[in-house]
Amino acid sequence: MILNWKLLGILVLCLHTRGISGSEDHPSHPPAEDREEAGSPTLPQGPPVPGDPWPGAPPLFEDPPPPHPSPPWRDLPETGVWPPEPPRTDPPQPPRPDDPWPAGPQPPENPWPPAPEVDHRPQEEPDLDPPREEYR
């Protein structure tokens, strides 16, 4: 409880020394920072007007840089050379009828030995639910 009274006393002391009150009887002294910047532009008084820019705000778009004497996109070769010819590529050849693997890289050789023969006959399934003996 003592702590609350101390905080209240500090708050009242701060409010009294800063001159903050509910009435306009005492004009407050401007802080030292405001007195130094007397030449700075004043802030707008009242609510902002829709559409008006905020004072001192930077422009939305910067001005484009000045044009250079020869921009890189204008350094094109002579008109007879443009557009350049694409590199020549041979068209793909149709597969030959006797070619088992027509185009592209050849398949790798199978490194695995052949699998053993598997008996595919149906096996008798074990009875998972054997009959129970009746206890008397």
Curated annotation (Swiss-Prot):
Keywords: Secreted, Signal
Location of the region described as Disordered in the Swiss-Prot/TrEMBL record: 20-136
Presence of the UniProt keyword Signal in the record: yes
Signal peptide stretch: 1-22
Annotated transmembrane regions: none
Keyword Secreted applies: yes
Pfam families in the cross-refs: SPR1
Recorded GO CC terms: extracellular region
PANTHER family xrefs: PSORIASIS SUSCEPTIBILITY 1 CANDIDATE GENE 2 PROTEIN
UniProt protein name: Psoriasis susceptibility 1 candidate gene 2 protein homolog
Organism: Pan troglodytes
